């Protein structure tokens, strides 16, 4: 039997891989390049459109635990990410072009996968995984709305500008990771209070791209436009993306008033993205505002920040923790449209949907990952949260099943969560 997977983003690619490696034939549909989205630039699978960072790689962070669980489950996304990582302190960042090319190659070359480059405008019959992402095309969105009977929720993800390293005035900046964790991987642009005030005034008065009347302004906190943060007040920036804590200037030994960080975006180290500066400003306005950042006065912007709609379904009402649609047992959903937020989380949901679609086809019992694991905690959250107030969520230890013992020290507590998660996933592998 064959399974149809719609969408070759992180979730769809992972789902197709998990099915194929279990001997299931997969028909993988991807509409790019026949039909592009407002945010994608290539026809590659698993294209990273926001940041090139897959976030923390350490086991004291929930997303670090999630990655390690996925490695143990032979994730194609983690194989590709680990093989084309770039320096990023304690985080896992990748060369986005190499990463997408690697995922495309591995999935396409699998003998059980057939790739079809066309738009899907209706929900197929037979075993299907829908992983069309936050930018699902209008015809399919309408079909999904008809299927679910639920109103869609809208919010906007925003991507940060990328600049050429050669154009940065290195005399005005310094290289350092916060609290000197890992290798010194970030370019830091320090600001005095006066410089910050000038930057802030320019930012809050800059012109944004107008939103359509019918689109509600709901932003996910983890990817909020810098100008929206700024309008909440100066402290939102100073305690957010521009916080100077742990970034003392090695040339003076003093902590700057504010710091703008740049993170390496490609393996060659020629491109850097401005961390936390996802934006919906007009391109001309972006250029003007960036000029107020010390060291970036003459910066060459190779990609301006863009903003796009994000769409997700009301998973607590519609899905089981297997990522299976409650009203149709051979239909699965995966990726950001389920309300998991983040690259790694999306891929992990695809992994679960792929495994369970394989089990469905093979007549095996579907699996619910334990809430003690990062993978299971995400599946539990999106299917058990209050449907009236459901919002997307990143992986975090707050979603894990509580520990049996009381541990006050946060680091030790997180280490215990991680230890328990990896013990649990190791035992759980026997069911797969």
Swiss-Prot record:
Main localisation: cytoplasm
A GO MF term: flavin adenine dinucleotide binding
InterPro entries referenced in this protein's UniProt entry, alphabetically: FAD/NAD-bd_sf, MnmG-rel, MnmG-rel_CS, MnmG_N, TrmFO
Enzyme class at the top of the EC tree: transferase
Position of the signal peptide: none
Gene3D superfamilies: FAD/NAD(P)-binding domain
GO cellular component: cytosol
NCBIfam families with a match to the protein in the record: gid_trmFO, PRK05335.1
HAMAP family assigned to the protein according to its UniProt record, in alphabetical order: TrmFO (MF_01037)
Protein name in the entry: Methylenetetrahydrofolate--tRNA-(uracil-5-)-methyltransferase TrmFO
Phylogenetic classification of the source organism: Bacteria, Bacillati, Bacillota, Bacilli, Bacillales
Gene from which the chain derives: trmFO
């Amino acid at each position: 039997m064959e399974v149809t997977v719609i969408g070759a983003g992180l979730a769809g690619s992972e789902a197709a891989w998990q099915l194929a490696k279990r001997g299931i034939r997969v028909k993988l549909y991807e509409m790019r390049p026949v039909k592009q989205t407002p945010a994608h630039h290539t026809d590659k699978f698993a294209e990273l459109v926001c940041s090139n960072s897959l976030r923390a790689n350490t086991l004291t962070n929930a997303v670090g635990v999630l990655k390690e669980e996925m490695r143990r489950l032979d994730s194609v996304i983690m194989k590709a990410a680990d093989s084309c990582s770039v320096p990023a302190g304690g985080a896992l960042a990748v060369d986005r072009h190499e990463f997408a090319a690697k995922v495309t190659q591995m999935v396409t070359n699998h003998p059980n996968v057939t790739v079809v480059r066309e738009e899907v405008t209706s929900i197929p019959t037979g075993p299907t995984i829908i992983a069309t992402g936050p930018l699902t095309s209008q015809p399919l969105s309408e079909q999904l709305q008809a299927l679910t009977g639920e109103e869609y929720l809208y919010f906007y993800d925003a991507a940060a500008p990328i600049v050429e390293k050669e154009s940065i005035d290195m005399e005005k900046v310094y290289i350092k990771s916060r609290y000197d964790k890992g290798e010194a991987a970030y370019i830091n642009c320090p600001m005095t209070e006066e410089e910050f005030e000038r930057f802030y005034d320019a930012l809050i008065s800059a012109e944004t791209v107008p939103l359509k009347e019918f689109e509600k302004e709901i932003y996910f906190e983890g990817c909020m436009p810098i100008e929206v943060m700024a309008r909440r007040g100066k402290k939102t920036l100073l305690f957010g993306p521009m916080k100077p804590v742990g970034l003392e200037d090695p040339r003076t030994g003093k902590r700057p008033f504010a710091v703008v960080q740049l993170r390496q975006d490609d393996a060659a180290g020629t491109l850097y993205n401005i961390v936390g500066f996802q934006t919906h400003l007009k391109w001309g306005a972006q250029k003007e505002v960036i000029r107020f950042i010390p060291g970036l006065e003459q910066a060459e912007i190779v990609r301006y920040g863009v903003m796009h709609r994000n769409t997700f379904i009301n998973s607590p009402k519609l899905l089981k923790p297997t990522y299976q649609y409650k009203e149709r047992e051979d239909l699965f959903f995966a990726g950001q449209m389920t309300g998991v937020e983040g690259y790694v989380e999306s891929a992990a949901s695809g992994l679960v949907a792929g495994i369970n679609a394989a089990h469905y086809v093979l007549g095996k019992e579907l699996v619910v990952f334990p809430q003690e694991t990062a993978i299971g905690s995400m599946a539990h959250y999106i299917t058990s949260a209050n449907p009236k107030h459901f919002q997307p969520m990143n992986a975090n230890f707050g979603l894990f099943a509580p520990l049996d013992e009381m541990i006050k020290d946060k680091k030790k507590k997180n280490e215990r969560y991680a230890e328990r998660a990896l013990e649990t996933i190791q035992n759980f592998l026997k069911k797969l």
